[in-house]
Swiss-Prot record:
The organism of origin for this protein: Chloroflexus aurantiacus (strain ATCC 29366 / DSM 635 / J-10-fl)
Biological role: One of the essential components for the initiation of protein synthesis. Protects formylmethionyl-tRNA from spontaneous hydrolysis and promotes its binding to the 30S ribosomal subunits. Also involved in the hydrolysis of GTP during the formation of the 70S ribosomal complex.
Gene designation: infB
G5: region residues: 386-388
Family per record: Belongs to the TRAFAC class translation factor GTPase superfamily. Classic translation factor GTPase family. IF-2 subfamily.
UniProt keyword Nucleotide-binding, yes or no: yes
Residue segments, region G3: 296-299
UniProt xrefs under CDD domains: IF2_eIF5B, IF2_mtIF2_II, mtIF2_IVc
Residues the record lists as binding GTP: 250-257, 296-300, 350-353
Any one GO molecular-function label of the UniProt entry: GTPase activity
Localization per Swiss-Prot or TrEMBL: Cytoplasm
Name of the protein in question: Translation initiation factor IF-2
Domain (tr-type G): residue spans on this chain: 241-410
Length: 745
């Protein structure tokens, strides 16, 4: 340290090794402000050029010198003025620089300037921790909402006709996962967004003890589901006689279309492809000032479903049988459909003009399949005709009118129209076109209609001959144009006041139809389900459809079922149709309509029948041994009786020692005298002097401190009886298993 006086610093700074060039200035740049001890440059935080300080002030400045930005000092750094002459230098004793003296000063050292070490020693920005905190908050997962408490309703819950599993969960308070588990137990595989119908929802909610009611929308209240109910609801004074609707059925090439052609005196048969009717045609004729409507259902087996629909809208069935060919499989199938529909039948024995015709043989064959004509003491009229020669056609028409008079067919022509779709198609030029049979009321042009899942407005109507119509009365078949979609055959047409309401109902029905199809595919009609309904008293009769490889097998199965019916009276099994050959789509349709089970004895379904059965959930059982069929029928019928619980004793042991564990449980050291001990699946009885003092389960089974699953006779082991600590030496143990055995007839 030198005691020499400090030399003038007017031209050179000492702190940074850089010349300030501010000689003659009134105030040294970098000097501390009075009372603050802080450099002006430190407070501004900007880059200041000394040359900008000159000018009129008379303070020369060094051109282009940049002052380094100096942040505020931290608490460990002394004030800048202490190092720049704001106070006496503690090391040299140099007095502070005078405010008015000329000469420069040493700039701040250690912080600022272009000193790289000073830049490294600067404190971090105060905003960096805040930014890190914000980033942490953004990365933090959002809080999960609190679980909503499950509130189960006290009274019945109103449910719509169709809903999703999620909507059912929200309406009832039952978790969607619990509903899906219950549906899985019931044999229905679903997801949370799958639509289910009300019947399925009510069945599932019954398992949870929740009562439900169906909430039918107001616009659905007046919707027609059954035409017969509409006819019953009509005022008797408004009812008027209507023409009969006649369906022609029979085996392929037995002359059905030619018979209808002879009746209408047209050449319809020549226009058919291959001589086989390809669609359901509806025609109306006039006889003795009275009208008769005919439905020509195809006789080929590939169109069995269309024939079934024809039987549902008909009043009278004319069964055509060729006099030279006899009763065929399609003939028997048509008879089964007629019986299932419950409509009167007229037998028309055709081709009597042929030399090989034998009407008596035909009548005998019909009697063998359950159709007894009037000549044989039955109630089925029989008419001999020849479609080719037009023999006795008038006699057949008179018989149809006679049967119609006996049936007293009536309808109300003044009511809004209600009918059934016979067929529908998409025409390239006209759009959706449907053939409808009016069954009650009168259909007019510009009527708003609802047809199944389709709505629309009647834009045009045509008769069977192609004539434009303005209205159609009961029993009249018409072709209508104006629907917004193609309906399904068998859908009910109903006149609506508002087209908007009709569209809403059509959309609702589309949802319901999808739900029903999915539910039917998941649930189906199985043998176990039918017997479950029998057990609950819902079904008193079991319907069966039998198909076999030979007639002898059919007779043997029929005799077997007759014996089962005689052995018990609780449930009667009825064979609604039987035949020889493969299981057809017609068999599936009949089973679907009559809730029947199909039994194939050495008979398999064709591909179309298999797909149809899978789509609608129809149960088809296959057998090749008649005793297996007998056993299954007996087991299914026995399922109506309460099952019995049978005990099977599997082992005995005696207690030879006891040990008490720190958990206060008692370990019994036993010797297995007979049978075996199993850790799971067995119950144990503790007997003391022959009296049962406890009945429970085994919670632990060990040998030499090792857990074992089973101990056989002749070995010792240790065990703990669950929930029982009073076991004593000398007690006898009996190990048994419970088995549920179905009751037998």
């Amino acid at each position: 340290m030198s005691d020499k006086p400090r030399r003038d610093t007017g031209s050179t700074g000492t702190g940074s090794g850089r010349s300030t060039g501010q000689s003659g200035s009134n105030r040294a740049v970098g000097a501390p402000n009075p009372g603050t001890g802080r450099s002006p440059n430190a407070s501004t935080g900007g880059n200041r050029s000394a040359g900008n300080q000159a000018g009129n002030s008379g303070r020369p400045a060094s051109a282009g010198r940049n002052q380094a930005t100096t942040p505020a000092p931290n608490r460990n750094t002394p004030p800048a003025g202490a190092r720049q002459g704001g106070a006496a230098n503690a090391r040299t004793g140099t007095p502070p620089v005078a405010r008015g003296g000329g000469g420069g000063v040493t700039p701040p050292t250690g912080r600022g300037g272009n000193n790289p070490r000073a830049a490294r020693n600067q404190p971090r920005s105060r905003q960096q921790p805040e930014e890190r905190e914000r980033e942490h908050v953004l990365r933090r997962p959002p809080p999960q909402p609190a679980a909503r408490p499950v509130v189960r309703p006290r009274g019945p819950v109103a449910l719509p006709p169709v809903m999703t599993v999620r909507e059912l969960s929200e309406a009832t308070g039952i978790g969607a996962a619990d509903i899906l588990k219950a549906m899985l137990k019931a044999g229905m595989l679903a997801n949370i967004n799958q639509q289910i119908d009300y019947e399925t929802a009510a069945l599932i909610m019954a398992d949870f003890g929740i009562e439900t009611t169906e909430d039918v929308p107001e616009q659905m209240a007046g919707i027609v589901e059954d035409v017969k109910e509409v006819l019953r609801a009509q005022p008797p004074e408004e009812m008027r006689p209507r023409p009969p609707v006649v369906t022609i059925m029979g085996h392929v090439d037995h002359g059905k279309t030619k018979l209808l052609d002879a009746i209408r005196s047209t050449r319809v048969a020549e226009g058919e492809a291959g001589g086989i009717t390809q669609h359901i045609g509806a025609y109306q004729i006039e006889v003795n000032h009275r009208k008769i409507t005919f439905l020509d259902t195809p006789g080929h087996e590939a169109f069995t479903a269309m024939r079934a629909r024809g039987a549902q809208v008909t009043d009278i069935v004319v069964l055509v049988v060729a006099a030279d060919d006899g009763v065929k499989p399609q003939t028997e199938e048509a008879i089964a459909h007629v019986k299932a529909a419950g409509v009167p039948m007229i037998v028309a024995i055709n081709k009597i003009d042929l030399p090989t015709a034998n009407p008596d043989r035909i009548k005998q064959q019909l009697a063998n399949v359950g159709v007894i004509v009037e000549e044989y003491g039955g109630n089925v009229p029989c008419v001999h005709v020849s479609a080719r020669q037009k023999i006795n056609i008038d006699g057949l028409l008179e018989m149809i009118l006679l049967v119609a008079d006996l049936e007293d067919l009536r309808a109300n022509p003044n009511a809004p129209a209600v009918g059934t779709i016979i067929e529908a198609k998409l025409d390239k030029s006209r759009g959706p076109v449907a053939t409808v049979l009016i069954q009650n009321g009168t259909l007019h042009l510009e009527d708003n209609v609802l047809v199944g899942c389709v709505a629309g407005k009647i834009k045009s109507m045509f008769s069977d001959s192609g004539k434009r119509l303005r209205h159609a009365e009961p029993s009249t078949p018409v072709e209508i144009v104006g629907l917004e979609g193609v309906p399904q055959a068998g859908d009910i047409l109903q006149v609506m006041d508002d087209l908007v309401v009709a569209r809403e109902i059509a959309l609702q029905r589309q949802r319901q139809q999808r739900a029903e199809v999915m539910a039917a595919a998941a649930r189906g009609t199985s043998l176990e389900e039918l017997f479950g309904k029998v057990k609950q008293g819902q079904v008193k009769e079991l319907n069966l459809i039998l198909k076999a490889d030979v007639q002898g097998s059919l007779d043997a199965i029929a005799h077997l079922i007759e014996q089962l019916n005689q052995s018990q009276q609780a449930v009667q099994t009825r064979i609604i149709h039987r035949g020889v050959g493969a299981i057809t789509e017609g068999d599936v349709n009949l089973a679907l309509a009559s809730h029947a089970i199909i039994i194939g004895f050495n008979a398999r379904p064709d591909p179309a029948a298999r797909r149809h059965a899978e789509q609608h959930g129809i149960d088809i059982r296959f057998y090749n041994i008649i005793y297996q069929l007998q056993d299954d029928l007996k087991k299914a019928m026995a399922g109506m009786l309460a099952p019995t619980v049978k005990e099977v004793v599997e082992g005995y042991a005696e207690v030879r020692n006891t040990f008490r564990l720190p958990t206060r449980e008692v370990v019994a050291g036993v010797y297995v005298s007979d049978g075996k001990i199993t850790r799971t699946g067995q119950n144990v009885r503790v007997l003391r002097r022959g009296v049962v003092i406890h009945d429970g389960k085994i919670s632990s089974l060990k040998r030499f401190k090792d857990d074992v699953r089973e101990v056989t006779a002749g070995y010792e082991c240790g065990l703990i009886v669950e929930g029982f600590n009073d076991i004593e030496v000398g007690d006898a143990l009996e190990f048994y298993r419970q088995e549920t055995v179905a009751a037998s007839l």
